[in-house]
Amino acid sequence: MPTISHFSRRATLILMTLILLGSAFLRFYGLGAMAELLHGDEAYYGLDALSLVENPRLQVYFPANTGREGLWMWLLAPMVAGLGATPFALRVTSALVGILTIAACYRLGRESLGQQAGIWTACAMAVLYWHVQLSHIGLRVITLPLMGALAFAVLFRAHRLGRGWWLAGALVGITFYTYTASIMYVGYAGLWMLWWAWHNPKQRRGIASALLMIGVVVAPLLVSRLLLTDATPSVLRAAASDAQAIGQNLVNWAWAWTGRGDVSSTHNLPNRPVLDIPLVVLAIAGFVGAWQLIKQKWMLIWWAGLVAVALVPTVLSVETPHFLRGAGLLLPCVMLLGVGATWLTHWRYGRWLVVSLLVIAGTHTLIDFDTWLNTESDDFGITYDYRVNEGLYLLDTLVDSDLQIMMPGVVFHPTAAFISAGLNRDIIFYDWLSDEDCYLSPITEYAVLDLPIELNNFPNRVPPFVETLNTLVEDPELDYRIHTITPPQAITSGWESAPTFGEAISVQLIPPERATFASGEPIAFQLAMQINTALPRDDYRVLVHLQSDPTPYEGGTLYATGDTALCSLAYQASARDSDLVALQPLSLTLPDDLPAGEYHVAIGFYTPDTFERLPLMPTENAHDYHRAWEFSVSE
């Protein structure tokens, strides 16, 4: 039987087609089961891609979520545009990139090790569990092995043929847009080009063009990173603390290949090693056969160096072995396996042994990923992502599609934001602190996804601010509750004619149920405020005065005051939809000696330092207060 290196172009095409079909099966398997499963980091990418669809622009760096390079969002945007804002759109993009990586690995293996090794390198990447797992999650790291393989393959081709340097430089530069750790690949490629230029004067001009192209391509991202430095603290937080920690990281990675792998259920079937027994056999064969098979010995140095530079980002960080930060190791790993497979095929029945080992490894990968789907997918992401996934999709089936969704107690949740966008539903987040005694409410019926892990005791806190509370679902483990709420009748209309202060705060007072009180009684009521524009300050106070006719401004008596700070939620509402109303409880205590008669509550807003009041429109008086409610005091 001839070796693959003697196969025709047609035979190679058939083999690669079969390999790609097998890799596609492994990477598309389980996507249906993950259709309603979304990680917070994936959601951030999806939201950025959605923003590109809604507002097309050339943006190379996205500062949200500690800052991310732009290539992944550019790839996601057309899929989100075509398939909608769904977890499936993100994951199918990742799977497709993973499949393309198999083809790129063939090219890299062929350029560096020969055609036969290229075939086996592609096979190794196709069945490697590490890469299959990454191909199922919508994180930008999946682009690193693809662009790394393409960049190095074209770079080696340019070095071999003495042409195509500009394309090599462009691909190396684009690699910088994949993942934080890509800086090691880009820097390493640059060092090799400088080395080649030193030893081969004929290639200096081409290498110079490649280096120039790298500089041109990476410059926009470098500038954006320098201008947006918010990502720096996150990098430092993930850094190893000292030399002892770095040493332990090296030990952890040494053990990760055959012993204990990444513990994260996002990146791995927890603790699964990189290599199972069939791939360990190929790896050992790779170490044995590398010197014999690799004719250009400098390639061995390049290979070892690639391992070293790919280890740097993960060895210098925490939580090793970390299969995201260490993703640069995928290429040297599968190249080692490809060399091992090639070496074994020189032995009698070696080809069948290699095929058997790869089939077994692929079967292990399929079984282990199925195990991950059945046992670990609930832990996919941060603590409460799965609650949001399950709760929102269930809410969508139970609640009318035109109802707004509220998530009080959550400042912002990317998973909920992306899923709600895909469901074409409006969702509002706001931080409802435990000591916050006011509330944000839509003016029409709305739904609430209540996460007890984020906001304790919502059903007991909200009744003073609602007309009715209907709990549709209460998860047995209290992971989430789903409510529908009818707001107070008083805030559902009348805003067009409501008095407005400073052209910013429209008000309506929600009075007590009765309008007659006795002296000495406390009176509790709510002030409903619709914020029409951003407030210029964050320290306004609410004027709450008990008056009668004549008013204090006309020589009458100011009987009581209940002035208080404007609640913080009013400032949150100022940046949101005008249909959102801040409800702030207010109170006055009637003096014990208050005479019987007719009284009114005056409402206004002022600054605490100058006591300057916000002007009232339409004007009711010269003192910018609104006569909000009238009541009687009995004998």
List the model feature ranges, each with a label.
Residues 2-241, 245-345:
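Membrane-integral, polyisoprenol-dependent glycosyltransferases
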Residues 34, 273, 352-402, 406-433, ...:
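Membrane-proximal, lumen/periplasm-facing interface regions of secretory-pathway glyco-
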Residues 39, 145-148, 406-409, 448-449:
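Active-site-adjacent beta-strand anchor residues
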Residues 41, 144, 380-384, 575:
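Residue-level preference for long, well-ordered alpha-helices that form the structural scaffold
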Residues 44, 70, 74, 249, ...:
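Extracytoplasmic/secreted proteins, especially bacterial periplasmic and envelope-associated proteins
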Residues 53-56, 258, 331, 398-399, ...:
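Sec/Tat-exported extracytoplasmic proteins
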Residues 392-405, 411, 418, 424-635:
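C-terminal luminal/periplasmic domains and tails of membrane-associated envelope-modifying transferases
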